[in-house]
Amino acid sequence: MLRVATAECFTHGFVGREIHASASGYTGELGSEILGTELEGKVSVVAACFIPTVSGLRSLLGIDPPEPDEVSKSGAKAYREETDRKVAVMMARAVRERTGADVGIGTTAGIGRGAICLDDGEITLLGRTDVHANLLKPDERIRKRQLQGIKRSLVMFRAYFRCELDELLEEEWVEEVTRDLP
């Protein structure tokens, strides 16, 4: 059984929830629109964490992320896009290692497009949203970016689960792939 853990910021834990719904065979309102029941009995969610703050990243994941460019009124970190990409990788790797999962998924978005990372210790996939938004200036783009981030995270995980990485890499939103081959 494939074990997955998520450390999520702008996707608010919904990626882990959707994977769990599919793995549990939930249908209807409880089910996953994107994954269906494809993962039933084949995947286990070790943890699905919503971690919007730097202090949360430090205490829960044991990482030392860069200081945020800005901080929201609620204390949420707000990095610019380039730093979000680096932090998403840190989050995915740390949640995988910390929980003993086979796969870690990290998502974060502050100012710009959202960053999505999937890491299994050998393969690191880095994707992004197309939607630009600013966490410090909330408007409808925040929600659009979140929904696209959830969908793309699930599409990325599904491609990984199905061993369809070559097809995934044809998507323009998958920015980087690192394969550490023996």
Swiss-Prot record:
Pfam families: HcgF. It comes from the Archaea. InterPro entries: HcgF (IPR009625). Transmembrane segments: none annotated. Belongs to the UPF0254 family. This is UPF0254 protein MK0012.
